[in-house]
């Protein structure tokens, strides 16, 4: 496919080799305006804002990825395969599954289980294990230590279903030691693997699946600074 694509008006060279991808395009706008020097908007199609600027001398882009694996799948596929992006770091919210993972904690997704059939397109003779880039995981852990930010590192689950009809679903993933639930990492990790590129998920816990604890939608846009700074 030629660029611009139906979903992204950027031209070749408008997007950095490293892209941060929150689900919320307003969070992308917040990151660009708060952290990037001289940010330039490269996309507004469907209000999925994308910006490129510099952070501590390094060119960085930030772009919304939407909700769910189909949306993340489209945007990350185009970035990897049409815009020559090398690294995508998803920064988003997640629901905690374990007792020792609390609201506002940061989780580094080392791997992502999924109930999606996204991987069926590859026609593999088995089940693929969507995994983050080790180099990005190790670097994120190192930066978190430098900042004094405690993090949980482990497995997350990427689900196609936000409102599940099965009340036992969360309990089953919890028993397997999965740290939290979200909706995008597995597709991102699979796209990266297929393209021979790098990917990582850094998540902030916005609510707890087994306790009545949550933060507001507004706070999700603007208060996840520790996660953002690790990703940058």
Kindly give the residue locations of the regions a language model identified:
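Metabolite-binding pocket within alpha/beta catalytic cores that recognizes anionic/polar moieties
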Residues: 1-128, 134-135
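Glycine-rich beta-alpha junction loops
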Residues: 25, 95, 157-161, 187, ...
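Expand to "…catalyze enediolate/carbanion chemistry for C-C bond making/breaking, isomerization
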Residues: 81, 165, 194, 202, ...
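Active-site rim beta-loop-alpha module in soluble metabolic enzymes
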Residues: 127-176
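A C-terminal functional module that forms or caps the active site or interfaces directly
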Residues: 167-206
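His/Asp/Glu-rich mid-to-C-terminal helical/loop segments that flank catalytic regions of hydrolases
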Residues: 209-232
């Amino acid at each position: 496919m030629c660029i611009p694509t139906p979903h992204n008006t950027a031209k070749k060279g408008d997007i950095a080799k490293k892209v941060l991808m929150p689900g919320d395009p307003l969070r992308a706008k917040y990151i660009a305006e708060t952290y990037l020097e001289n940010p330039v908007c490269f996309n507004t199609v469907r209000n999925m804002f994308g910006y490129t600027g510099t952070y501590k001398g390094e060119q960085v882009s930030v772009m919304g990825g939407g909700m769910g694996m189909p949306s993340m799948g489209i945007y990350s596929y185009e970035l990897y395969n049409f815009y020559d992006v090398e690294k995508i770091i998803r920064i988003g919210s997640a629901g905690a599954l374990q007792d020792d993972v609390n609201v506002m904690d940061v989780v580094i997704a080392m791997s992502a289980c999924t109930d999606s059939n996204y991987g069926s397109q590859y026609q593999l003779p088995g089940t693929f294990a969507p995994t983050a880039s080790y180099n990005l995981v190790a670097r994120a852990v190192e930066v978190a230590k430098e900042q004094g930010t405690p993090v949980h590192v482990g497995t997350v689950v990427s689900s196609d279903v936000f409102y599940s009809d099965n009340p036992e679903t969360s309990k089953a993933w919890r028993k397997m030691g999965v740290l939290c639930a979200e909706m995008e990492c597995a597709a991102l990790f699979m796209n990266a693997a297929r393209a021979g590129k790098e990917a990582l998920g850094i998540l902030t816990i916005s609510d707890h699946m087994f306790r009545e604890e949550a933060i507001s939608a507004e706070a999700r846009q603007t208060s996840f600074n520790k996660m953002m700074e690790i990703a940058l």
